[in-house]
C-alpha cells in the first residue's frame, strides 16, 4: 500500500506535467530540481489548497487502511 501524497507531491504532480509538456526531453532529475526550486518560491497562501488536499488524502487513506503502518 502506498502512502498518501504530501502537499508537495500534490502540487508537483500537475506542475511536472506542465514541465514535461514544454520540455519533453528534459531528464527527470532536472525536472525534480526545477520543481524543488519553484516550490520554495510559493507563498504560504498559494500552498493552502495543496495542504488541504494532502490532508484530505491522508484522512481518506486512514479510513481506507485503518491498520496501516509505514514500514520502509
UniProtKB/Swiss-Prot annotation:
GO terms for molecular function: DNA-binding transcription activator activity, RNA polymerase II-specific; RNA polymerase II cis-regulatory region sequence-specific DNA binding. SUPFAM superfamilies: HMG-box. InterPro entries: HMG_box_dom, HMG_box_dom_sf, SRY-related_HMG-box_TF-like. Keywords: DNA-binding, Nucleus. The keyword Iron does not apply. It is found in: Nucleus. GO terms for cellular component: nucleus. Pfam families: HMG_box. Its main location: nucleus. Residues 1-69 bind DNA. PROSITE patterns: HMG_BOX_2 (PS50118). GO terms for biological process: brain development; camera-type eye morphogenesis; negative regulation of transcription by RNA polymerase II; neuron differentiation. This is SRY-related protein MG44. It comes from Tarentola mauritanica.
Amino acid at each position: 500500500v502506498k502512502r498518501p501524497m504530501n502537499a508537495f507531491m500534490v502540487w508537483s504532480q500537475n506542475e511536472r506535467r506542465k514541465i514535461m509538456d514544454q520540455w519533453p526531453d528534459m531528464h527527470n532529475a532536472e525536472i525534480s530540481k526545477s520543481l524543488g526550486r519553484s516550490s520554495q518560491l510559493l507563498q504560504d497562501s498559494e500552498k493552502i489548497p495543496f495542504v488541504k488536499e494532502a490532508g484530505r488524502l491522508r484522512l481518506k487513506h486512514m479510513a481506507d487502511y485503518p491498520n496501516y503502518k509505514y514500514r520502509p
